[in-house]
Amino acid sequence: MLFLNKNAIGKIDQGVIQTAVEKAYQLVLSQLYNMPDRIHVEDHENTLLLMPCFSEKFFATKLVSVFPEARQHGQPAVNGVMVLSDNTSGQPLAIMDGAAITAQRTGAVGGLGVKILTTESIKTAGILGAGVQGLSQARYLLYNREIKTLYIYDLSNDAVAGMINTLKQEFSDLEYVAAKTPKQLVVNSKVIIAATTSKSPLFEATPDDILGKIFISIGSFRPDMQEFPSIIIERADNVFVDTLFATKESGDIATPLKDHVIEKDSIKEFAGLLEKNEIFENKTILFKSVGMALFDLTTASAIYQLAIKNNIGQNLEF
């Protein structure tokens, strides 16, 4: 069995990960997969997720914990283990760092959202949240678009500074701005990506603040979490979700639905965009991702196959 840690997974090219995420959406369209509802256990502010999924060749199970307060102790908020197995024999093939898989595939989900929902003319963007996922979102944003100015906001100034320093090593040909407030970031950005576990909207907005912009919410995955104010979904020309499970799981969708700000039939699955060649020019769009085990499966299987080919990782025996 192959063991792949964070460093091994980090050697995989971003294009491989994003292609794997796109393959997951294609499987959604073809329905050639089996993805049971994930088990979602809450313990006060903390969450445990068990996420299984099956395809023709592989099946995968990810066990992930989300402890938001861990960052205050210098620890990552998300930890996890991914097991990839052969769907013919049932034999485990690989064990992987689940947090690294989550960070990479979720970054690619946001990146693919940027690629499909925006034009190449966008030059300004903002990231709300400077944790592991905020960094991953920034990397995939910059992989897909030549941004000239990137605004970053976090409650921790040190986290913002650290994220900027890390990004500069890989993407040096742009201006980085440590936003003083979320509102400053939103006003000055064409694309806004939120990667937080906020219990309440990160900012207040007027219609002029949001008109013609793309909003991507990545962080909220419980009904009591909401990153964006409901005026965005109310005024949006289009609302997309990676899975319809988001209508129940995330407060960014569930709360506006409960308050009758939007009707459920106005919410579309992002996978449908892969069948079209639609261009969204000057549209206000909300894309909400809560993630799904199918992303983990296609990402893990792509990484595994490339790791075997290139002799990446460590072989283990039970």
Model-derived features with residue positions:
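Glycine-rich Rossmann-fold phosphate-binding loop(s) that bind the pyrophosphate
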Residues: 130-131
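Adenosine-phosphate binding glycine-rich loop
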Residues: 221-318
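Short helix-loop-beta connector
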Residues: 117-124, 210-211
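N-terminal ligand-binding/catalytic initiation module
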Residues: 1-102, 111, 121, 294-297, ...
